[in-house]
Amino acid sequence: METLSNSILTVQIAEHGAELQSIKKDGKEYLWQGNAKFWGRRSPVLFPIVGRVWNNKYRHAGNTYEIGQHGFARDMDFKLTYKEDKGAVYWLESTPDTLGKFPFPFRLLVGYLLEENKITVKWRVENLGAMDMYFQIGAHPAFYFPEFDAATKDRGFFVFDRKSDLEYIMPTEKGCVSPERHVLKLNKEGLMPIDIHTFDCDTYIFDNKQLKKITLLDKKKKPHISLEFNSPLVALWSPTKTHPDCPFVCIEPWYGRCDSVGYSGELKDREWIQKLEPKETFDVEYKIIIESVSYTHLTLPTNR
């Protein structure tokens, strides 16, 4: 376990999965602590796929491969390759075992950098092979609802960087998406209220680059945590449908998503697949912002 700190935040990261374990400010924990009653993870890195492939199988170059939900990186031990007080970098390379599930030699680097009240999470994917590589990558951090009280129905609000209603898709019981598109209507203040029934649909998947920032507000509409990202998709998930007393929500920037129901095509033709030519690299990042440090810089949408 490695610890990063500055004058505002203290962050802990595990080598297993290169996964965030803790985000504290003034001794207060912001990152979900992985109680298995609800969900045993905290902030897994999703690679080399996001979500599920149909029937847990996919096809590439005439062969069929089996891979589980969200890939395997989250369950592997990374190596620490760089460390200072405010930053750390972890790396993972393909092995004979991973090549049996994902037939591409790769290197994955995951970096964390503290700057004031922000944590920048950086990913680099390198294609070490001689053929084009097809992959997806995503984040799955979980955060405590502010001022959580299981005896009440309300959990807070989301505010987005756009004021208009949003389109979303959602997974079926088998974890793959159906073609139906749905509209998320925001309230008169441009907010998405969160209560114990908000996630009866399980997951909201916003695609087509609709969003670049999501902020979780407390019940008084004060900013608590924000995520900034450039990913083409972002998901919101909380298991409150099966666990109404669940105290957390996930905000998940994705470069890819699960299969559509019944998909039987090739890996390279999956929706939102990423492609790397031999020796190319893929570099992206997202930011976690502890907004409760200051409420002065975030402007809520005006009434529409």
Model-derived regions, located:
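Acidic, contiguous internal or C-terminal segments within carbohydrate-active enzymes
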Residues: 4, 96-147
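Acidic-aromatic substrate-binding/catalytic surfaces of carbohydrate-active enzymes
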Residues: 7-64
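Acidic/His-leaning functional-site neighborhoods
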Residues: 9, 25, 65, 70, ...
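Short Pro-Gly-centered flexible turn/kink motifs
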Residues: 13, 58-66, 123, 274-291
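Extended, loop-rich substrate-binding clefts of extracytoplasmic carbohydrate-active enzymes
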Residues: 63-116
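Beta-strand-rich interaction surfaces with strong enrichment in secreted/lumenal proteins
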Residues: 109-111, 271-275
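Active-site/ligand-binding surface loops and adjacent short beta/alpha elements
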Residues: 145, 149-230
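Conserved small/polar residues in nucleotide/adenosyl-binding loops
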Residues: 295-302
